[in-house]
């Protein structure tokens, strides 16, 4: 039996990068997957097509995780399509990087609305759809929550808030048999990282690799494989944890 056989999972921000990889790996592990996206329908459809081509089951649903009505619709459509919900992965992210002097109030609120309010809204909605057997929540945080980088003050603060939220909720939701954990990726090769200037051969990439004991940047599948484990019954006694997946970069 596959690790996530008969499970239904919602993965937010799953049209590309880490979210897309998690969706694909969940499907390969037997889960029925909702590929959520905010604006990239083409990317989400591509992920769904790849999953179905490989024998999996997935649908794409548009929703802005910072919009309460959108979030409510996301989970109602999931329930209608698959009849239940077992796993929620909060991966949708606003990655704004700038010196503190250049951060506008609008950019600040956008980051917190997506990175912090978004998980609040999705978790509230998910709790209404988990059956009496409990559920599983994975928040995709960042190593930047523990080791912030220059020009990433607001982004780092949102992820630190998400980690605190995860720990607090583990104490609140354990009695409902709902597990919740954070995964803190290290320097991972994604479109978001590239938009922040961490491109192949850049000084940023060289710095990250030099400080990573395993000598390379992570790939989205490195994070996805950890997510499959945390989502599975193999991790049944793991909750409230901040699980670093960084090639050793944040192992100090």
Where are these regions (language model features)?
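Conserved glycine-rich cofactor-binding loop
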Residues: 8, 15-16
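Substrate-binding pocket helix/loop in short-chain dehydrogenase/reductase
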Residues: 99-100, 107-112, 204, 208
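Active-site helix of classical SDR
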Residues: 123, 158
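Alpha-helical segment proximal to the catalytic Tyr-Lys
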Residues: 128, 171-175, 236
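Residue(s) in the substrate-gating loop at a strand-loop-helix junction
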Residues: 142
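Short C-terminal tail/terminal secondary-structure segment
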Residues: 147, 228, 239-252
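A glycine/serine/threonine-rich, flexible loop-to-helix segment
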Residues: 175, 187-212, 222, 252
